[in-house]
């Protein structure tokens, strides 16, 4: 692979890793904010999303290392809306996945 292509690939993979790490924080936060009698399955689903985001970040980081790059320590944007009703949380989760 050409050096320029490697640099582009590493940059993109680092962006993916940063985005996925923000998902870990976001979904973990959401799982702690859900309340009410129906919370258990929703909390489990949110924790599962956090685990999946961490796995994706790890894969992207491994590819960065494999290409001779340096995995980023940054994290993607985290916006706190202060809305913690389940509908708001699910809408924000959907928006994050787009």
Task: Identify the role of each PLM range.
Residues 1-98:
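Iron-associated oxidoreductase/ferritin-like identity signal
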């Amino acid at each position: 692979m050409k050096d320029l292509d490697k640099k582009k690939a590493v940059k993109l993979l680092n962006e993916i890793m940063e985005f996925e790490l923000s998902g870990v924080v976001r979904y973990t936060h959401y799982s702690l904010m859900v309340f009410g009698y129906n919370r258990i399955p929703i909390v489990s689903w949110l924790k599962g999303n956090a685990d999946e985001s961490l796995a994706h970040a790890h894969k992207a980081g491994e590819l960065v290392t494999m290409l001779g790059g340096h995995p980023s320590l940054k994290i993607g944007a985290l916006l706190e809306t202060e809305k913690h009703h389940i509908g708001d949380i699910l809408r924000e989760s959907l928006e994050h996945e787009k």
